[in-house]
Amino acid sequence: MSKEIAKKRIEELRDLLNTFNYQYHVLDNPSVSDAEYDRNMQELIKLEAENPEFMSEDSPSVRVGGTVLDIFEKVTHKSPMLSLGNAFNEGDLRDFDRRVRQGIDDANVRYICELKIDGLAVSLHYEKGRFIQGATRGDGVTGEDITQNLKTIKAIPLRLNEEVTLEARGEAYMPKRSFVKLNEEKEQNGEDVFANPRNAAAGSIRQLDPKIAAKRNLSMFVYGLANVEEKTIPSHSESLDFLGELGFKTNPNRRTCETIEEVIAYVEEWQEKRPHLDYEIDGIVIKVDDVALQESLGTTAKSPRWAIAYKFPAEEVVTRLTGIELSVGRTGVVTPTAELEPVRVAGTIVRRASLHNEDLIREKDIRIGDYVVVKKAGDIIPEVVNVIFDKRTGEEEEYHMPTHCPACESELVRLEEEVALRCINPTCPAQIREGLIHFVSRNAMNIDGLGERVITQLFDADYIRTFADLYSLTKEQLLQLERFGEKSATNLVQAIENSKENSLERLLFGLGIRHVGAKAARTFAEHFETMDALVKATEEELKAINEIGEKMAQSVVAYFDNEDVLELLQQFKEYGVNMTYKGIKIADLQNVESYFAGKTVVLTGKLEVMGRSEAKKKIEALGGKVTGSVSKSTDLVVAGEAAGSKLAQAEKHNVEVWNEERFLQELNK
């Protein structure tokens, strides 16, 4: 076959396969058999392999999955992906309607209602009609680049029907039938199953190997247009129509409503129809349809005033409580958990539910053998709502919390003003394991690839008992563990080695000193600069630091007044773990050349590691100016957790937005 004929045939096959994909995954109306589709795909793959010069990034063949990735790169969203306020009942919906009408002084409001897909929110970027990048929502400001995995989802067009530049947003999800099939395969292979379709979708999207994502049969509904060049669309409903014309899959069950009564009827209708869908929904999204009215209403500190998410009531089911098991946390708190006869709740099989503490068991008179009502709080965490007393036979057993720790048999205590029972034995194995999980977590030592499962493996193999033991681990030890190969073992050893260079505040937070969170750890690290200086500090010296109270000061002094802790710190030194503050102190910032010099910065939301007042001082010390509102003269918005209206203003004025992690990176350069 000549090059010219091969090129022509490749183009024909691409057009044909794109049409087949659109008919099957968007229109849900396939025109060919699976066998015919596969024959055409195999022919295309063969021709592209023989003629690599004709390969294209938007070829249907890329949907089978490409090169394995080492890591997901971070992506800053051009406009923040905001969350919505919630409504839980008819009264909340009527309050929303009243606020909308008061806000625009106009009785002629039209709403658009859409099913709230329970999946993973993603953004899709197209340049001149070609799909160039996809990202997760992340924290709303920064997500992860998952382009290669999204290319495997056949409901996402790789090339649009127009050469338009835009950003679309939607929800990637796993159909129920695909979820059932996937879990059956995992059970057959002896692997852990996914709890629900949402977790399965999220886990599939974040696979480093796109070929795995390609096998998971994910789909996607696009629900919004974030940015589009050279085009003004007057309503949300028209933007969805436009997205459909471009080749996107939009949910066909949306409806425009002229009154709040029609909205409520739509909500009630889909609450009944919900179980019959082949995908999970957890509510209804209601938006003011007119874009001009949306802009007029604006946003609050947390969410748009023109939209709300109605959350379906948590599904409640009855099952039998067969036992109560106990778990011990890293601080020694002993938490009771109900063991249940397996029951399906909100799409997943539930075998356990939280009982919180002994007082709740007494208050609800929960006994072993009782029939109980179980629901998922927010459709996520199972909990026991109440006992069905009419079903009691008299054979149920009252439960009494133990007097000794289930993990180490030390006597349990109840501290003053606490409802929880605690184990105060510092050598309790359950506390040590949970403490190790905290030590390696993201805000602490941030050791990549070392989570709860691996910590448990290492602990059960008796490889680790203290934080310092992590730094003596070898590749040979890791290779003895299940699911570890040469590459993963090498990567983990290197990640542990890299963590030795962390600044002091991460180590302090990782130690899990009672009352000392990430922010306080940073305050101590900056003030004392070295671990040795902090260890020697008196309670009075600690209390003299701004925002450090008596309880925290006493806790820190008591922690370091312990021979085992001092021995641990000595081991850290021997392994080469850094125990000095690597950040910049405010007093040292005056002569530093900085990005912030001459910049106007707005801080919004909750900053976890560094409080806003401290961040303000540092920016100002570096020559920047911190203001309380976003305008055209703003250079940067730093957004923490639960940031709201200022993000929308940043989008309006095209101002750059950073999350806290990016801010700290720049600050510590």
Swiss-Prot record:
Catalytic machinery residues: 116
- The EC number of this protein is 6.5.1.2
User: InterPro entries per the record?
Assistant: BRCT_dom, BRCT_dom_sf, DisA/LigA_HHH, DNA_ligase, DNA_ligase_AS, DNA_ligase_CS, DNAligase_adenylation, DNAligase_N
GO biological process terms, alphabetically, are: DNA repair; DNA replication
PROSITE patterns xref list: BRCT, DNA_LIGASE_N1, DNA_LIGASE_N2
**What domain of life?**
Bacteria
**Catalytic reaction equation(s):** NAD(+) + (deoxyribonucleotide)n-3'-hydroxyl + 5'-phospho-(deoxyribonucleotide)m = (deoxyribonucleotide)n+m + AMP + beta-nicotinamide D-nucleotide
Annotated residues that bind NAD(+) are located at: 34-38, 83-84, 114, 137, 171, 287, 311
| GO annotation, cellular component aspect | cytosol
Residues holding Zn(2+): 405, 408, 423, 428
User: What GO annotations for molecular function exist for this entry?
Assistant: DNA binding; DNA ligase (NAD+) activity; metal ion binding
Q: Cross-referenced CDD domains, in alphabetical order? A: BRCT_DNA_ligase_like, LIGANc
Keyword list, A-Z: DNA damage, DNA repair, DNA replication, Ligase, Magnesium, Manganese, Metal-binding, NAD, Zinc
Cofactor(s) needed: Mg(2+); Mn(2+)
Where is each BRCT domain found? 591-669
Q: Which family is this protein grouped under?
A: Belongs to the NAD-dependent DNA ligase family. LigA subfamily.
Q: What does this protein do?
A: DNA ligase that catalyzes the formation of phosphodiester linkages between 5'-phosphoryl and 3'-hydroxyl groups in double-stranded DNA using NAD as a coenzyme and as the energy source for the reaction. It is essential for DNA replication and repair of damaged DNA.
Q: Tell me the protein's name.
A: DNA ligase
Question: Which source organism does the UniProt entry give?
Answer: Bacillus thuringiensis (strain Al Hakam)
Which taxonomic lineage is given here?
Bacteria, Bacillati, Bacillota, Bacilli, Bacillales
